[in-house]
């Protein structure tokens, strides 16, 4: 998960005027944002027979009633295309010992529909058809209720239509800080 870089993007405080000051302020702002705690997930997506899994860290519960989950997906990602067209997604919470799995889903996914694997990881279709990794400690499955344009990403708000555990409820799940990965800022 690489962080996009480029020219600093505002807004900037009034005392930040020169290009050099903007660059330094942008670096500071990124370091602060990288301190925000994040989970690390594999989001599953489906449209018809097309399926995908993608490493994702921008996810949160946004409502109790109804139960809503929000995920932010980069617009040029294949997963974005599938969620937009299919209207569903799964959020797979991996156990901490599955660090290698999230690295596998940073790269393009090889789908074996006959063997029911994504990048070699077994999956089953959830109630909506979104893939749920068999290795996931827990998962939620959502139907998109409200996509929100957020610049380079879309924040998909989905209603939880199914959820479950595939490991003991006390299993520690993977977080960004458990790896050397970073995405944000």
Residue ranges and their predicted role:
Residues 2-185:
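Basic, polyanion-binding surface patches
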């Amino acid at each position: 998960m690489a962080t996009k870089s480029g020219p600093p993007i505002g807004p900037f405080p009034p005392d930040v005027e020169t290009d050099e000051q903007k660059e330094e302020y942008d670096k500071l702002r990124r370091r602060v944002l990288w301190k925000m705690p994040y989970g690390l997930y594999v989001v599953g997506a489906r449209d018809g027979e097309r399926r995908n899994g993608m490493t994702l860290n921008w996810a949160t519960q946004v409502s109790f009633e109804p139960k809503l989950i929000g995920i932010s997906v980069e617009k040029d990602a294949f997963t974005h295309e599938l969620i937009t067209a299919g209207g569903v997604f799964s959020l797979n919470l991996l156990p901490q010992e599955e660090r290698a799995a999230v690295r596998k889903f940073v790269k393009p996914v090889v789908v074996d529909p006959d063997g029911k694997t994504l990048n070699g990881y077994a999956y089953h279709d959830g109630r909506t058809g979104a893939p749920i990794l068999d290795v996931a400690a827990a998962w939620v499955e959502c139907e998109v209720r409200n996509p929100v344009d957020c610049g380079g990403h879309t924040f998909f708000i989905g209603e939880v239509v199914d959820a479950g555990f595939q490991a003991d409820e006390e299993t520690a799940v993977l977080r960004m800080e458990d790896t050397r990965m970073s995405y944000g800022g």
